[in-house]
Amino acid sequence: MKRLTTFIAGAAVAATLGGCQQPAVSGWKSFSGDKNIERRVDSVLSLMTLEEKVGQMAQYSCNWDVTGPVMTGDYETLLKQGLVGSLFNVYTVDGVRKMQEMALSESRLKIPVLFGYDVVHGYRTIFPMPLAESCSWDLERMRKSAAIAADEASASGIAWTFAPMVDISRDARWGRVMEGAGEDPYLGSLIAKARVEGFQGGNDWRSLADVNTVLACCKHFAAYGPAEAGRDYNTSELSQNTLMNYYMPPYL
């Protein structure tokens, strides 16, 4: 049974990635509005091997020693081979530069790496936890705190934050309640919007091209918050009505 499951999973992945053998962006809506960029993306995709395309979906986390960020296992080798799309927990200018130069100087296609970090309640300037901020109902201040965090994080080379957490929390036993905006879906939705706009520089995607903005990531999957018994990563059991009325709104 295990072999059959593995075969089916492998076949599904192969079928999905089979379409990657041809340039895939020609039919997409252009978010850049720059045809030269679109043509370059098409060109790079046509040059990539299947392994390199899969590698762009892989993210590895860096560890630290006294000299700065280090990569464990074969991650550094994979980075040099162009088989890493993003790195997590590299958060100094020197660390980012070291990893980026490695990718740009030694990989075949010189595709830059995307650097992500959990910028949850400030980067260098620390703000109250999101739950505490939400108690103020001050959306503008929450937008500004996210904008300040984006300004500081982007100066360190970070381009992507795993925030805001927009899970609705209704069980105080869950250990991640303080990362979100609490139990109210309406307030949670307004705060999610304010924080995303703060991180990304507004509600226009083009502001992501600014040097002082970062890509936001509303997390986690909807209905991750009502984990049974408050145990993180546990299952959730709820009706369709509860899902759509209480847990989905912040994601919409």
Where is each model-derived feature located?
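N-terminal accessory segment at the very beginning of proteins
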Residues: 1-3, 23-24
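Sec-dependent signal peptide recognition
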Residues: 2-10
